[in-house]
Curated annotation (Swiss-Prot):
EC number per UniProt: 4.2.1.33
Swiss-Prot/TrEMBL cofactor(s): [4Fe-4S] cluster
Alphabetical list of HAMAP family matching this protein: LeuC_type1
Cofactor comment text: Binds 1 [4Fe-4S] cluster per subunit.
Broad enzyme group: lyase
Gene for this chain: leuC
Superkingdom of origin: Bacteria
Species whose genome carries this gene: Buchnera aphidicola subsp. Macrosiphoniella ludovicianae
Protein name stated in the entry: 3-isopropylmalate dehydratase large subunit
Record-stated family: Belongs to the aconitase/IPM isomerase family. LeuC type 1 subfamily.
Keywords: 4Fe-4S, Amino-acid biosynthesis, Branched-chain amino acid biosynthesis, Iron, Iron-sulfur, Leucine biosynthesis, Lyase, Metal-binding, Plasmid
Function: Catalyzes the isomerization between 2-isopropylmalate and 3-isopropylmalate, via the formation of 2-isopropylmaleate.
Length: 442
């Protein structure tokens, strides 16, 4: 039987298969952060259980950390408790931790790939929805809940149903000024935020083949925004070049053996997909969200749609509600709307290539005095590389604040947040109501 990439990885990790299309899978890598892990460790202690595979478990502090300084008190009392608890848990259970004082600390979905922890063919889980990022390497990766975090800690396994297979082939020539973020926003905008529900999505096509690993990570990061369980991209020479000589990558004879295996990680020629879409992005314009859902997307030169013309009553009501929350009028242009803040960062767009692109646009320019703008590198490694290249100076000279690594304004769990009614142009992945702060407009 010919198999898809998803089926190959799933099948190779089955420990026990049940009759209802559900299996117990072995988990190769378990990523932790300070927000969704405390209850799991508490439960382990209550049941007097140990962590099954500490060497296959890695933790960092990212959601709550202050990007102003490395003071553990910098994001409030609750954040301090969670970070202190993670430190205690990792020490007790012998788990590697990049805490706030580690020079390599940063966003978990930035650190794991850049250090070579994320490898093709792996199963990877984390108590965070954007774990799909790691699918860019041909790894089956997805977010899990806190009770599942506990189960993986205790057993290094997880019960998972089989999902259907979707293929999205992206073709054409990438227009000037178009990024991977524009491409995935366009796909979500056209297909909807639930089109991937019940599926693992494999992205392919000549556009994907020409992308760097960091661009591919942006694509897979937002697979969850189209409702998918995860996103996948088959590994290729670009993947291998990125991983070579990383700290946790295989080396020597193990590298050669890994390459032999990785080259088998692709969908067979006649593998069956439940749904297939082909999308030509040759004429794509820059994309921007206008509402409170990732599929409420338009080109930057388009008007906000007239929701009265929508055939679906549900979509009409959602769009009307979004316009009200965002303080926008139908059939108006977003280019005429002033903003209060700008955020460059997040697990979607805080890598070195993202910062290079932003710095190229900002060089010799100055932002308005009425706008607060911040740049938050995705990790200590990204920050140091950007500073070696002088990108920090470009941002600072343009009027941006150059911050320390963390999740920052991607979500309102730290001191970086929007005030009620403020508008933010954000490089993050979600524009939900209150996502960046109560009453904030993304």
């Amino acid at each position: 039987m010919n198999k898809t990439l998803y089926q190959k990885i799933y099948d190779s990790h089955i420990i026990h298969e049940e009759k209802n299309n559900t299996s117990i899978l072995y988990i190769d890598l378990h990523l932790l952060h300070e927000v969704t892990s405390p209850q799991a460790f508490y439960s382990l202690r209550q049941k007097r259980r140990m962590v099954r595979q500490p060497k296959k478990t890695f933790a960092t502090m990212d959601h709550n950390v202050s990007t102003h300084n490395r003071d553990i008190n910098g994001s409030g009392s609750m954040a301090k408790i969670q970070m202190e608890q993670l430190r205690k848990n990792c020490d007790e259970f012998n788990i590697s931790l990049y805490d706030i004082n580690n020079p390599n600390q940063g966003i978990v979905h930035v650190i794991a790939p850049e250090k070579g922890m994320t490898l093709p063919g792996m199963t990877i889980v984390c108590g965070d929805s954007h774990t799909s990022t790691h699918g860019a390497f041909g790894a089956l990766s997805f977010g899990i809940g806190t009770s599942e975090v506990e189960h993986v800690l205790a057993t290094q396994t997880l019960k998972q149903q089989r999902f259907k297979n979707m293929k999205i082939e992206i073709i054409g020539q990438i227009p000037k000024f178009i990024s991977a973020k524009d491409i995935i926003l366009f796909i979500i905008g056209k297909x909807g935020s639930s089109i991937g529900s019940g599926y693992v999505v494999e992205f392919c096509g000549n556009v994907i083949e020409t992308m760097s690993m960091e661009e591919r990570m942006t694509i897979c990061n937002m697979a969850i925004e189209m409702g998918a369980k995860s996103g996948l991209i088959a590994p290729d020479k670009t993947t291998y070049a990125y991983l070579k000589n990383k700290i946790y990558s295989p080396y020597g004879v193990f590298w050669e053996k890994s390459l032999d295996f990785w080259q088998t990680l692709k969908s067979d020629k006649d593998a069956f997909f439940d749904k297939i879409f082909t999308i030509d992005i040759s004429n794509l314009a820059p994309q921007i969200t206008w509402g409170t859902n990732p599929d409420q997307v338009i080109s930057i030169d388009e008007k906000i749609p007239n929701y009265e013309t929508f055939s679906s009553l549900t979509q009409r009501n959602l769009a009307k509600s979004a316009c009200k929350y965002m303080g926008l009028k139908k059939e108006s242009y977003l280019t005429n709307i002033s903003i209060d803040k700008v955020f460059i960062g997040s697990x979607t767009n805080a890598r070195i290539e993202d910062l290079r692109l932003a710095a190229k646009i900002l060089k010799n320019k100055k932002i308005s005095n009425n706008v607060q703008a911040i740049v938050v590198p995705g990790s200590g490694s990204v920050k140091r590389q950007a500073e070696r290249e002088g990108l920090d100076k470009i941002f600072i000279n343009a009027g941006f604040e150059w911050r320390l690594p963390g999740c920052s304004m991607c979500l309102g769990m730290n001191r970086d947040r929007l005030n009620v009614g403020e508008r933010c142009a954000s490089x993050s992945n979600r524009n939900f109501e209150g996502r960046q702060g109560r009453g904030g407009r993304t």
